[in-house]
Each structure stands twice: as structure tokens, then as C-alpha cells.
Amino acid sequence: MEIRRRPPNPSVKVAHLQYAIPHADAEPRHILEKIVWEKDREVETARQRVPLETLKSQIADLPIPRDFIAALRQASRAPAVIAEVKKASPSQGVIRADFDPVLIANAYAEGGASCLSVLTDKSFFQGGFEVLVEVRQTVGLPLLCKDFILTPYQLYQARAAGADAALLIVAILSDQDLTYLSKVANSLGLNVLVEVHDAEELERVLNLGGFPLIGINNRDLTTFETDLETTETLSQQFATRLQQQGVLLVSESGLFNRADLDRVQAVGAEAVLVGEALMRQSDVCAGLQQLMIGDEGTSNS
């Protein structure tokens, strides 16, 4: 799947005024392309407001990032859970009206999450880097910056806000960009979670090599529909190569109960990323524990 980047608008000069002329075909074809185009604009604005050198100076004073991958491998209960701090999504709208990142992060930590994922996209998920900062100040768990990362600048933003890992979505990146952004992330001490959705994307990642943490997103980002068979199909199709490269496999999206966790764990997922199912719980801590323990928890209560 090819995701077009937002074309720059040509300009014409009339007298002393410069006008931008929108492209006739400058319309995104689906929601993912719309998000990417908006992200391009968002990053341009952020660069003007906070120069890269400012972010670098902020990072210089920060402690070394936590080891996101090690935290998943050392989880006391399998699969390890990456619990997500998410207020809204393009498909569901506002998921949690009483959104308090501090309370949610504390509940996740108490409930037994191995790591947290924090949405920093503002336009479509109502997140922000300020949310990541709040969560970082609240808990000691490793944090994933979950965003549509297209540029090195965003990785510096993530690191400055307290992230320990960053999401790189294969569908929106070329092989060259994926490799380069991964190197930049690693130079900042960030682990990388590389996200794929289909066989072509996973093939690309495995051919490049050097990605120890791969997430299979059960959600098609062009339609936002989910299907757990995505994890089952890809993990089995590429089982040998995943094992040969020592990949820690994460199943993302569409996971709502312990049976779902068992289903993806049975095909090799060592970790899961869960957001909506937990954000809809009135008691987030209890919801996380029930997700992790399932019937075992009710039988012992």
C-alpha cells in the first residue's frame, strides 16, 4: 500500500503578493492518508515553534531511557501488556470523556501493565506531547510514544517528552525512511516498535533486519476495521523468520478479553497492546487485571 505524502501547493506571484494554489487532486484517499497529510502540517508548525536545537538541549538533561523491550521480556504474566492512554480515535470518537492521564497511568501501573503506550497525536486522537509529559512524571514504567512518525524531529519530540520507545508504522514509511528513523531513535536511546498490518509490510521489515520488536496491527488503518486473524495469519506465515531474528512479537488492537489474549499468544505473540477495551472500563485497574487473569481471577475471588 502506497501512502502519498501531502503535495506542496504551487504558488504564483501577483504584484507584490504570493498566493498558494491548491492542487486539483490534493485530497487524501482514505483516513490514513488524511492523518499523514495533517501530520506533515503539524510537524511544520511545531518546528517553527520549538526548534530542533531547543529539543536537543532539553534531552541533554534527561536520564537514560528505560528499556522497553526488556520490560516486556521480564513480564511476570504472559503475554505482557502494553496498556494504552488514549482519549479518542477517528473511528470511535471520544472513548473516555473523563480522561485523566495521571489517574489512568497510575491505575495501569497498579494493575500490572509492563509498559504504557501514550497517544501524542492531537488532531485525530486528542492526545499530545503534554499528555506524555504528564504520564512520564507519574509512573516509572517504560513509555511508548504512539504517533504517526514521519521525521526525525518527532523522535526528538518524543524523547524530550519522556518516551522510552517510539512507534514506526511501516505503511507510511519507505524502507529508507524506516531504516533512517530507526537509527535516529536508537541514537536517542529509544527502542522502536515497528508496526505492520500485512504480509508485504512484514516481509519488508524482515528483509531489512535488525528490528527486535515488531507489532502486528489487527486494525487496517485505511478503514479502521479490526480482525484478530491478522496476527494469526502473519505470525504463522513468518514464524520461522521471526524466530530466527529473535523478534518479540506484539499483537495490537481488537483485544478485549483474556480469550483474545490466549488466541494471539497461541500463535507466538509475547505481548499485546490494548487501548479501547481498557479505556471503556469504569475501573481501569480492575479491568486490566481481569483482562490479564480472565476466569482465573473470578474463580479465586
From Swiss-Prot:
InterPro entries: Aldolase_TIM, Indole-3-glycerol_P_synth, Indole-3-glycerol_P_synth_dom, Indole-3-GlycerolPSynthase_CS, RibuloseP-bd_barrel. The keyword Cell membrane does not apply. Keywords: Amino-acid biosynthesis, Aromatic amino acid biosynthesis, Decarboxylase, Lyase, Tryptophan biosynthesis. It comes from the Bacteria. One of its GO terms (biological process) is L-tryptophan biosynthetic process. Pathway: Amino-acid biosynthesis; L-tryptophan biosynthesis; L-tryptophan from chorismate: step 4/5. It catalyses: 1-(2-carboxyphenylamino)-1-deoxy-D-ribulose 5-phosphate + H(+) = (1S,2R)-1-C-(indol-3-yl)glycerol 3-phosphate + CO2 + H2O. CDD domains: IGPS. HAMAP family: IGPS_B (MF_00134_B). This is Indole-3-glycerol phosphate synthase. It comes from Prochlorococcus marinus (strain MIT 9313). The gene is trpC.
